[in-house]
Structure formats: C-alpha cells, structure tokens
Curated annotation (Swiss-Prot):
It is found in: Cytoplasm. Functions in the N-end rule pathway of protein degradation where it conjugates Leu from its aminoacyl-tRNA to the N-termini of proteins containing an N-terminal aspartate or glutamate. GO terms for cellular component: cytoplasm. GO terms for molecular function: arginyl-tRNA--protein transferase activity; leucyl-tRNA--protein transferase activity. GO terms for biological process: ubiquitin-dependent protein catabolic process via the N-end rule pathway. The keyword Iron-sulfur does not apply. It catalyses: N-terminal L-glutamyl-[protein] + L-leucyl-tRNA(Leu) = N-terminal L-leucyl-L-glutamyl-[protein] + tRNA(Leu) + H(+); N-terminal L-aspartyl-[protein] + L-leucyl-tRNA(Leu) = N-terminal L-leucyl-L-aspartyl-[protein] + tRNA(Leu) + H(+). PANTHER family: ARGININE-TRNA-PROTEIN TRANSFERASE 1, ARGINYL-TRNA--PROTEIN TRANSFERASE 1. This is Aspartate/glutamate leucyltransferase. It comes from the Bacteria. InterPro entries: Acyl_CoA_acyltransferase, Asp_Glu_LeuTrfase, N-end_Aminoacyl_Trfase, N-end_Aminoacyl_Trfase_C, N-end_Aminoacyl_Trfase_N. It comes from Leptospira borgpetersenii serovar Hardjo-bovis (strain JB197). Keywords: Acyltransferase, Cytoplasm, Transferase. Belongs to the R-transferase family. Bpt subfamily.
C-alpha cells in the first residue's frame, strides 16, 4: 500500500520545460523532479533511487525527455561484485592514500581543487563560466543539501587529492559527484573513488551502488559499462534487468 501511494505520488510529480541537453547540446531535455524540504526518510529515498531518480542540490530528479531515451539508470548489485585483478591493482597503487568518510564539509581547499578539476576535465564546457559561477554551482549541487549524504575524501600527506559526495538510502549508496586532482593521472583517482565507495557500501551491508546515468557511446558517460556486474532500469516497466539482457533487448543503442 505504501509503495503504491509512493508510486502514485512519483507519477504526479511535475516535469520541467524543455532545455538544451547537457550531454547532447543538439537535443532537448526534460526532468521530472521533487524539491526536497527537510530530511527524507531513507526508505522513501530508496524508492526514488529504485525509480531512477538521483539528486543534485535539494532536487531529486530523473530524465523525462520526449525524443531521447539514452540516459539509462545504472546500478551495481553488491552481492555479485568482486574486484577484478585490475581493480585490485588499483587498490594497491593507491594504498598510501588516507580515505575518510564523514558528513559533507566545504573548505577552501576543496573549492580550489574543484576549479582545477573543472578547468582541466571540462575545459570546453565551462570556458564561458567564471570561477565564482562554478563555485556557486558546486556549493549548491554538492554541499547545499547534506541530509542523508556522505563525503569521502582521499588524502596524501594531509593534501586532499579528491572527494566524492554520496547519498545513503536504506539499501544503497548513490554516487552524486566526484572531484579529483588532475595532476595524478597514473593513480586513476576517479576509478579508485568509485571502487573504494563500492567496497564501503558492501561493508555497510547495502544491496546496490547507483552510478547515475549511463549513456552508451557517450565520450564522458560510456565508462560506466565497465563497472560490472550491473543492472539497467527498464524505462517502460521500471524493472531493473541485467546489463546483458538489456543490451540484447535494445540492440539499437550505441553499445
């Protein structure tokens, strides 16, 4: 009964006007969204994650585009996840890092790192934005709604090399965003942050790790297919099905 009421509530949520897509600028995007006021219960948050929602700032949202269905909600079933040999090498390579989990806490050091990360990784995308504009977005998107959130920091000799914001529901962790120092490419800090937080979720007894949207063939979002085993949310039924099964069913995607 409760899930039925939640589903009816989700179906009634507003849909935004169309705007230029941040992944494909030549396309239009829309989201279905819920502004959060105060703390949301972890069981309810889990229902939203299971329904394909993720969070930015104080907004839970999922894509609801008319002409495109390529933003696929992607999760790792943790009871099946075992680090590969390459993943174990990555853990060993970064074994000198100090990893801490705690409540999200904004510092000047993190702001400076965020700017360096954005200017390095997304140079063409943020070229028209000032540092102040980027930082305002960071503060709202990552630190503006700390309820049910965790921050993981990666440090070397007291210097922060990276941080990651995660949302914690009853049965899963959801990756919100990660930032890392572009001067350490050999460490693969982005992959290390995902791997370490997946293992942390397993330690917590979570069932799933949500990686956000997977866009097959997209230069910035295709990498998620390497985090296996995995499940993709079926848009029409809201069921989560194994990656391989989804791939066969939707052979027209840019796999």
């Amino acid at each position: 009964m409760i899930r039925h009421k939640l589903q009816n509530f989700v179906n009634s949520l507003p849909i935004s006007p169309e705007r230029s897509c941040s992944y494909y600028p030549d396309r239009l995007s829309q989201i279905q969204y819920l502004p959060l006021q105060g703390k949301i219960e972890k069981d309810n948050l889990q229902f939203f994650f299971d329904s394909g929602f993720r969070r930015t700032g104080n907004i839970l949202y999922r894509t609801s585009c008319n002409a495109c269905r390529e933003c696929l909600s992607y999760r790792v079933p943790l009871n099946q996840f075992v680090p590969s040999r390459n993943r174990k090498r990555l853990l060993k390579k970064n074994s000198d890092l100090v990893v801490r989990f705690g409540s999200p806490h904004l510092t000047v050091e993190k702001e400076i790192l965020y700017l360096r990360y954005q200017r390095s990784r997304y140079q063409s995308f943020v070229i028209g934005e000032s540092d102040q504009e980027l930082l305002e977005g960071m503060r709202w998107n990552l630190f503006g709604y700390p309820e049910n959130s965790l921050e993981m920091t990666l440090s070397l000799d007291e210097k922060i090399l990276g941080f990651m914001i995660l949302d914690s529901a009853s049965d899963s962790l959801s990756a919100v965003y990660s930032v890392y120092d572009p001067d350490y490419p050999d460490r693969s800090l982005g992959s290390f942050a995902i791997l370490y937080s997946i293992l942390y979720a397993k330690e917590l007894g979570m069932k799933y790790y949500h990686l956000g949207y997977f866009l097959p063939g997209h230069p910035d979002m295709d990498y998620k297919k390497h985090w296996v085993p995995s499940e993709i949310r079926e848009l029409d039924t809201n069921d989560w099905i194994p990656f391989e099964e989804f791939q066969k069913k939707y052979a027209d995607f840019s796999w």
